[in-house]
Design a protein with these regions (language model features):
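Beta1/beta-strand and adjacent pyrophosphate-binding region of the FAD-binding site
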Residues: 72-77
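Catalytic-adjacent loop/helix segments of enzymes that bind and process anionic phosphate/sulfate esters
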Residues: 27-55, 61, 129-196
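His/Cys-centered metal/cofactor-coordination and adjacent catalytic loops
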Residues: 68, 82-157
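N-terminal secretory/membrane-targeting segments
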Residues: 1-71, 87-91, 98-99, 104-106, ...
């Protein structure tokens, strides 16, 4: 919030005392009093957002829950890729995937758009630490962090085989370390990936 010197539970409308979560409670957002936040601001955008969030009932299910059970999951991170080049004649597999799968169209590169930051966001579902440099990226740190909730580890825990591939050398951006730590069997051009 603008003008707030520090963020505390009470500044977000929540109790400052510790909260015990039930097995059905998985989101800290449940402890935020959005109605109180809405009444405490004159900013119409914040007020409308808070009023909307006050009406949302947290749930573990949505329209996609279970829809793709027992299907394979393939994610493609293609830097500088233009969807105009997906055609039935030139790229039949990509064409089929884009017409029968789920595509996230509102995916944008991060500020200081370097490869490692976009790849980090896709793999982790988090924003990268923008204070880091290209050679000291968030991905480098991800090689040693505990990452049970990133996609590869989460799927592996559910019994999936998880693979990641890159058509360049494996130690570039430390992918040979980070991708293994994220739960993938990783292959690159210099480590097992046969590029023809």
């Amino acid at each position: 919030r603008s003008g707030t010197s520090s963020i505390t539970p009470s500044s977000l409308g929540a109790s400052s005392s510790p909260r015990t979560y039930s097995s059905n409670s998985y989101n800290v957002i449940e402890s935020i009093d959005f109605a109180a936040l809405a009444s405490g601001t004159n900013d119409e955008t914040l007020k409308n957002t808070d009023q909307y969030l006050a009406t949302v009932i947290p749930t573990r299910k949505n329209n996609y829950t279970g829809l793709l059970k027992d299907y394979n999951l393939i994610t493609i991170c293609a830097e500088s890729f233009c969807p105009w080049f997906i055609s039935e004649e030139l790229t039949p597999t990509l064409y089929k995937m884009t017409h029968t799968g789920i595509i996230f169209e509102n995916y944008y590169g991060t500020f200081q758009s370097v490869t490692t930051n976009g790849e980090y966001t896709m793999c982790m579902g988090l924003y990268p630490d923008m204070s880091r440099t290209k050679t000291d990226s968030s991905f480098n740190v991800a090689g040693t962090n505990y990452l049970p909730f990133c996609l590869g580890n989460a799927l592996k825990k559910k019994g999936y085989q998880t693979w990641a591939y890159h058509d360049y050398i494996g130690d570039f951006y430390n992918r040979n370390i980070t991708h293994a730590n994220m739960g993938y069997t990783f292959q690159a051009a210099d480590s097992g990936l046969d590029i023809k």
